[in-house]
């Protein structure tokens, strides 16, 4: 049976939308997804109350879509210079890199993990809801379950509280509009929630609430690190500058609105950091699958440039 030109065009359009969603995140996995997470292991926030065991040094990793690969370069230089954080907080793309690093991966292992990140989320496509009661659908084009499984596989299916480095993934509560830091529970689900761009990815349901991308309310979550007791905060900012947007599709317009909101919140958050590392990334579009190795090198160079100041801040505390 031949496919009509109209059907072919529709298929191409759907494929393009799916590809756009995948390119935005740039992360996926190939393992079979195990859909259920026991309620007892769903991510949640547990406040830090001890003054004795406060984290001294926190590494805060921003959102930034594919630009998040630059976070790995930052980690490479910190590791090479013996600078190890006690706490890692990530938002969106930063939550994914942060989860893997906090689980005990070395910088080299992170580079290898980056090479395993592909676009096989195409098999994770969802039928979006049309608002018709009898026709059930998802609240996004991609479920994000493959991403969840990818992260859980990489961290060896350990819960966040069992990581060697304390970790928190910041997501946005879709009901209250407030950020939450998931610092215990299922790591893959926490990273998925933190990375669920609204409209593209289905907001996961966690403890009866829907959660979307942390970049909406806390693009560089310095406040979350301070709330968990961090004394020194290194913040890494790889967020796409809103001034560099190329608005050629409905998705790019949505991303531009997303970026504008993040810029205003970001500047407030960064004022609370002790050191800010900003890799000089060329203004390529968010939907271009960028060169991983090149982004990692840019993260390295930006961190090398900040090393003298960083060492001084640590010595002074």
Predicted regions and their residues:
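Patatin-like phospholipase
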Residues: 2, 29-89, 100-317
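Bacterial N-terminal signal peptides that target proteins for export
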Residues: 2-19
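Gly/Ala-rich beta-loop-alpha elbow adjacent to hydrolase catalytic centers
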Residues: 90, 94
